[in-house]
Amino acid sequence: MKGTIFAVALNHRSQLDAWQEAFQQSPYKAPPKTAVWFIKPRNTVIGCGEPIPFPQGEKVLSGATVALIVGKTATKVREEDAAEYIAGYALANDVSLPEESFYRPAIKAKCRDGFCPIGETVALSNVDNLTIYTEINGRPADHWNTADLQRNAAQLLSALSEFATLNPGDAILLGTPQARVEIQPGDRVRVLAEGFPPLENPVVDEREVTTRKSFPTLPHPHGTLFALGLNYADHASELEFKPPEEPLVFLKAPNTLTGDNQTSVRPNNIEYMHYEAELVVVIGKQARNVSEADAMDYVAGYTVCNDYAIRDYLENYYRPNLRVKSRDGLTPMLSTIVPKEAIPDPHNLTLRTFVNGELRQQGTTADLIFSVPFLIAYLSEFMTLNPGDMIATGTPKGLSDVVPGDEVVVEVEGVGRLVNRIVSEETAK
């Protein structure tokens, strides 16, 4: 699997029923209005026969599902045309820890090494009434039917392609029921469905799994892009949040990246789109279970990004959700990397944002809540970081709305200067 793995939560009616009462309470206050998207990064993807690493002391659930495989570039596809963009389907397993909340991105639950086995692609025309079976050690353990999904494959492809261009090889996991099968080290998990070759994986204590030296490569020059929310106390206060006690990490899809001196589109009929100047840390070598003291040894260097957000699309599900943060071209980033040796202290850099020459945002990386080495140690505790992976470390206070015609310049001291222009949807066509 060489593309981006998108997945959707709360897409089975049993999940919505189970969480119905909770979704009326804080922090949700209402059921989700749109599909609740998340990303399974490249470290999660394994093939049939490869071991699923079992993290010590955790409860782990097998989430048998089916993956839609994109066959050609898809942008703003109508539901009735979706079949033209589907190469086929594959059995998949959205392995997960139990969900305690859907408010913030579930990176610890969903993004661990080997937590996304995917089988062979089969050229089926429709999976809207497909029964998916799970066997554990050769015995039936569970089954469910895709007819009980809230949104079918065509609806999901249409909804995702409305804001994110999909490329050949990308996949969409269609969802899982609320009830899933608990797995243990020593189990063999088999996912079955008519018309598909079985997807079978052993479950192995993660201490016995040799770190994979290579992972499926994405069809773009970048690795996984991790981003931090509320990692400056003044920015958290600006948005009326308490500073987080644990890093608020979310993932950004490749479609959102663009370069220096490029344009970003402000969608029609929105009220607030803002910039975010950020220092980006680029990983230089594979990192797993790295200590904070050793973490800087795994840094290749630094670059700059502008992590735009469309606040109109915020919902209290996996906040900040993909519609806010992973729209096409919404993350300008410099293509150059400044070697870490040229930046003696990444925690003493000034960040600035100018809009049409006016200084709108200024801060310092000295105010990071979670430092660069802490973030590397934190992430590598439960997942493998690979060369080319990036961590956008968050933004200080000073947000303001930007509109078509604005020139937005973000600077990080010693790292670089990034220029971007805002255009309307009509201009972008």
Curated annotation (Swiss-Prot):
InterPro entries: Fumarylacetoacetase-like_C, Fumarylacetoacetase_C_sf, HPA_isomer/decarb_C, HPA_isomer/decarb_N. The gene is hpaG. GO terms for molecular function: 5-carboxymethyl-2-hydroxymuconate delta-isomerase activity; 5-oxopent-3-ene-1,2,5-tricarboxylate decarboxylase activity; metal ion binding. Belongs to the FAH family. A divalent metal cation binds at residues 276, 278, 307. Pathway: Aromatic compound metabolism; 4-hydroxyphenylacetate degradation; pyruvate and succinate semialdehyde from 4-hydroxyphenylacetate: step 4/7; Aromatic compound metabolism; 4-hydroxyphenylacetate degradation; pyruvate and succinate semialdehyde from 4-hydroxyphenylacetate: step 5/7. The keyword Metal-binding applies. NCBIfam families: HpaG-C-term (TIGR02303), HpaG-N-term (TIGR02305), PRK15203.1 (NF011750). Keywords: Aromatic hydrocarbons catabolism, Isomerase, Lyase, Metal-binding, Multifunctional enzyme, Repeat. Monomer. GO terms for biological process: 4-hydroxyphenylacetate catabolic process. It catalyses: (2E,4Z)-5-hydroxypenta-2,4-diene-1,2,5-tricarboxylate = (3E,5R)-5-carboxy-2-oxohept-3-enedioate; (3E,5R)-5-carboxy-2-oxohept-3-enedioate + H(+) = (4Z)-2-oxohept-4-enedioate + CO2. This is 4-hydroxyphenylacetate degradation bifunctional isomerase/decarboxylase. Decarboxylates OPET (5-oxo-pent-3-ene-1,2,5-tricarboxylic acid) into HHDD (2-hydroxy-hept-2,4-diene-1,7-dioate) and isomerizes it to OHED (2-oxo-hept-3-ene-1,7-dioate). Approximate repeats lie at residues 1-215, 216-429. It comes from Escherichia coli. The keyword Metal-binding applies. PANTHER family: 4-HYDROXYPHENYLACETATE CATABOLISM PROTEIN (PTHR11820:SF114), ACYLPYRUVASE (PTHR11820). Its cofactor is Mg(2+). Its EC number is 5.3.3.10, 4.1.1.68. Signal peptide: none annotated.
